[in-house]
UniProtKB/Swiss-Prot annotation:
Organism the protein comes from: Macaca radiata (Bonnet macaque)
Subunit structure: Polymers of ZP2 and ZP3 organized into long filaments cross-linked by ZP1 homodimers. Interacts with ZP1 and ZP2.
Domain annotation ZP: ranges: 45-307
Localisation per UniProt entry: Cell membrane
Stretches assigned to the Cytoplasmic side: 409-424
Cystines in this chain: 46-140, 78-99, 217-282, 239-300
Record propeptide residues: 351-424
Glycosites: 125, 147, 156, 162-163, 272
Family, per entry: Belongs to the ZP domain family. ZPC subfamily.
Known tissue expression: Expressed in oocytes.
Position of the signal peptide: 1-22
UniProt GO BP: binding of sperm to zona pellucida; blastocyst formation; egg coat formation; humoral immune response mediated by circulating immunoglobulin; negative regulation of binding of sperm to zona pellucida; negative regulation of DNA-templated transcription; oocyte development; positive regulation of acrosomal vesicle exocytosis
Name under which the protein is recorded: Zona pellucida sperm-binding protein 3
Length: 424
């Protein structure tokens, strides 16, 4: 692998100008290293998996030699290799990921960054130092693209274009919809007795066609799907068990497409919980569109009229396990969350997660009691009336004040005019 690297060395000396040393170029050819003949204070060799740093003890070029104990490498302060005091260099040899080095991926290179630190300390009982503290940034750059073989490419009977493939991530989403399913619901508020219209989708792009399923869903008073209390809405790999009670919750048949699944849930709130809101977390997954639905991949609703389960698609017997509560090997349970995503926008109330499967949290769904709404409306009129009365009161006070001022000036004028009449 051809390696390219780069070293930026800047030493800021107290009371002096900044010294910058260019990086020497080291090339590994035939297992031998060749460096520039000019003496550099710091030499760096970026190898395939390691970093070799050689530091001259005359680091500042002043003739004052530094001590090896005052040199460390990286945020983790790795110490140099053991050397003889008579040697005029100090060496470090560490792995690229060692000593707290950081890695950055650019469009054309992998960049490993660290630094060499010279932190002089007093010797013995002395309280003085004779060299400066210096921090020298170090970078190793490795190209991300290149020909790793010097041999010519041998042709095959398959065109090269047939060996190229693309892998695209899947994007899952769970949204709260209006009753007509045509638009996303603008407000998260509900009244008890309403139904929440939920739409799960998977966006495949150029991926092969997939069929989406809601594996399980749970409602909690907080975004944490492991919170208590909780209520299970979908369980056993696609059984909408919330419809077993007095609710009419069900999957919508037929589905708009293989990549979309719609279902309704009769809204509720947890008893003795003053928050009057819930969050719904659903585990979404997808299978190839040509694969037949089975007990592990299904969407089943309960019909109270026939007292039986029925699927959105596929054979009817795949829903029989919903009554037994055992539909094969359990997937991610409520106590073992996979990935939780919450709404990031208050208006749209949805978040997308990119993976092969996803746990999506939608919420909060806020419930308004109808009696509470009536009380709010009743209180709205007195509030407006109080504003009106306040305005009338201020007007009366202003008029009374003006009348009092006029009377005071009138009396003063009459009092001032009486002595004049007496003198006449």
């Amino acid at each position: 692998m051809e390696l390219s690297y780069r070293l930026f060395i800047c030493l800021l000396l107290w009371g002096s100008t900044e010294l910058c040393y260019p990086q020497p170029f080291w090339l590994l050819q035939g297992g031998a290293s060749r460096a520039e003949t000019s003496v550099q204070p710091v030499l760096v060799e970026c190898r395939e998996a390691t970093l070799l740093v050689t530091v001259s003890k005359d680091l500042f070029g002043t003739g004052k030699l530094i001590r090896a104990a005052d040199l460390t490498l990286g945020p983790e302060a790795c110490e140099p290799l053991v050397s003889m005091d008579t040697e005029d260099v100090v060496r470090f040899e560490v792995g690229l990921h060692e000593c707290g080095s950081s890695m950055q991926v650019t469009d054309d290179a992998l960049v490993y960054s660290t630094f060499l630190l010279h932190d002089p300390r007093p010797v013995g009982n002395l309280s003085i130092v004779r060299t400066n503290r210096a921090e020298i940034p170090i970078e190793c750059r490795y190209p991300r693209q290149g020909n790793v073989s010097s041999q010519a490419i041998l042709p095959t009977w398959l065109p090269f274009r047939t060996t190229v493939f693309s892998e695209e991530k899947l994007t899952f989403s769970l949204r709260l919809m209006e009753e007509n399913w045509n638009a996303e619901k603008r407000s998260p508020t509900f009244h008890l007795g309403d139904a929440a219209h939920l739409q799960a989708e998977i966006h495949t792009g150029s991926h092969v066609p997939l069929r989406l399923f809601v594996d399980h869903c749970v409602a909690t008073p907080t975004p944490d799907q492991n919170a208590s209390p909780y209520h299970t809405i979908v369980d056993f790999h696609g059984c909408l068990v919330d419809g077993l009670t007095d609710a009419s919750s069900a999957f919508k048949v037929p589905r708009p497409g293989p990549d979309t699944l719609q279902f309704t849930v009769d809204v509720f709130h947890f008893a003795n919980d003053s928050r009057n809101m819930i969050y719904i977390t659903c585990h979404l997954k997808a299978i190839p569109a040509e694969q037949e639905p089975d007990e592990l991949n299904k969407a089943c609703s309960f019909s109270k009229s026939s007292n039986s389960w029925f699927p959105v698609e596929g054979p009817a017997d795949i829903c029989q396990c919903c009554s037994k509560g055992d539909c094969g090997t359990p997937s991610h349970s409520r106590r073992q969350p996979h990935v939780v995503s919450q709404w990031s926008r208050s208006a749209s109330r949805n978040r997308r997660h990119v993976t092969e499967e996803a746990d999506i949290t939608v919420g909060p769904l806020i419930f308004l009691d109808r009696s509470a709404d009536y009380e709010v409306e009743q209180w709205a009129l007195p509030a407006d009336t109080s504003v009106l009365l306040l305005g009338i009161g201020l007007a009366v006070v202003a008029s009374l004040t003006l009348t009092a001022v006029i009377l005071i000036f009138t009396r003063r004028w009459r009092t001032a005019s009486r002595p004049v009449s007496a003198s006449e």
